[in-house]
């Protein structure tokens, strides 16, 4: 009774206060509680140091969201490579550098979960039953199904299709119109997402599907892409216009794929050597005998194209801007391409998949772009069992998150000389080559979708690592290499003020801030 009376007396006292005093208490109590909680948390020796923050729940979201790499470096200087911060109600434990890559990417499946970290974000975009909306074992098999369309023989067929799409874009898009113009200005944040989706749909989904992928269809993918924002990560569904457009785009794209799948099945028109759709229609039965439904295949197609879209659109936009800042690098690539074609006695139309492997300046430019501008600045896993951090007394409790940032290591002077300088030639050195993970590493593991390098302690991991390593790395190099050689063979360009735009971290994928334009002119070898 004494406790009840005390509570009643407290309520009566609160009600007797003025409105101003009541509001002050209501606003002040959460802040006081937050400060006390942080102090008590800091006393625990089994927890990574927590970055101090003033605003409850919101935490360090502003400083992290605006400049994540600067935020990481500032925290590292104060706490070391391991620390935690509050992000919109979630405690993120960060482990920077190659040891952090090893800790997160090679963590046991029983200890961390990418599915629990991303499912609420990706399922409204991709659809149900695929990627993170299924057990990890299913995802590993889905990746294996997709890899049947990502073979060397497939890449050989893709190169001329990708080049043809780019050349057609040069003729038809208002940014270029190369049959009518000799010079002009192009916004790479318009051109590169479109070129990427047109080339990917043509090569991966076939000629019939490409005819459906007009600019209005590309806009649907743009609406889907807007579902990958920080607000979507926190609030998967809100009654807001961009959520409605995301959902409408998902339904329309999925229905389009379903129609094509149904048509091919009814016609019996399925060729295992044609494209990704046919490959999935043939290879889509799990080890336990369960078959993917056509709806799940359609959803997986969305996920695959979206994954590649992010990497290639952002990477090609960035390398066009950097090469515009340093046109002499374009000339190095141009001479390399021209000399190779001269030996063959042909022009750009004769450039093959095998030729792309003989162009070190092209591949080094892509590699350097991915170093400076990794599409995802942070990668999360949700902790499902208490997780001890090696060589420390820290334990990450169940329900918290671990965060790794290869992009931080890519741009840190601890691992790369002059990291802020765009220098493709750095990859010619033996030390730099040793930093990159080889496709043919002898230390390999098979998570269910084919062997990948087990080693993830490299400071350079643009395609991630472990069981969630991107399976599209080689396709990305084929697509990006063809885009780069086609641009350089036909055009020479600069950027205004010879200054590359700053990165925009407001979305989940790091893109250039607007305006992001190149000023182009035709080369003498231009094909129009």
Swiss-Prot record:
Q: What is the effect of changing residue 488 to I?
A: In strain: fluconazole-resistant isolates
- Regulation of catalytic or functional activity: The catalytic activity is inhibited by the binding of azoles clotrimazole, miconazole, fluconazole, ketoconazole, oteseconazole (VT-1161), tetraconazole, the triazole SCH39304, and the triazole derivative ICI 153066.
Domain of life here?
Eukaryota
Q: Name one GO molecular function term.
A: iron ion binding
Which terms in the GO cellular component ontology are assigned? cortical endoplasmic reticulum; endoplasmic reticulum membrane; membrane; perinuclear endoplasmic reticulum; plasma membrane
Carries keyword Phosphoprotein? no
Q: Give the result of residue 153 to E, as annotated.
A: In strain: fluconazole-resistant isolates
The chemistry this enzyme catalyses reads:
a 14alpha-methyl steroid + 3 reduced [NADPH--hemoprotein reductase] + 3 O2 = a Delta(14) steroid + formate + 3 oxidized [NADPH--hemoprotein reductase] + 4 H2O + 4 H(+); a 14alpha-methyl steroid + reduced [NADPH--hemoprotein reductase] + O2 = a 14alpha-hydroxymethyl steroid + oxidized [NADPH--hemoprotein reductase] + H2O + H(+); a 14alpha-hydroxymethyl steroid + reduced [NADPH--hemoprotein reductase] + O2 = a 14alpha-formyl steroid + oxidized [NADPH--hemoprotein reductase] + 2 H2O + H(+); a 14alpha-formyl steroid + reduced [NADPH--hemoprotein reductase] + O2 = a Delta(14) steroid + formate + oxidized [NADPH--hemoprotein reductase] + H2O + 2 H(+)
Q: Where in the cell is it found?
A: Endoplasmic reticulum membrane
| Role noted for this protein | Sterol 14alpha-demethylase that plays a critical role in the third module of ergosterol biosynthesis pathway, being ergosterol the major sterol component in fungal membranes that participates in a variety of functions. The third module or late pathway involves the ergosterol synthesis itself through consecutive reactions that mainly occur in the endoplasmic reticulum (ER) membrane. In filamentous fungi, during the initial step of this module, lanosterol (lanosta-8,24-dien-3beta-ol) can be metabolized to eburicol.
Q: Which family does it belong to?
A: Belongs to the cytochrome P450 family.
Please identify the protein, giving its name as recorded: Lanosterol 14-alpha demethylase
Could you tell me which species this protein originates from? Answer: Candida albicans (strain SC5314 / ATCC MYA-2876) (Yeast)
The UniProt gene name for this protein comes to ERG11
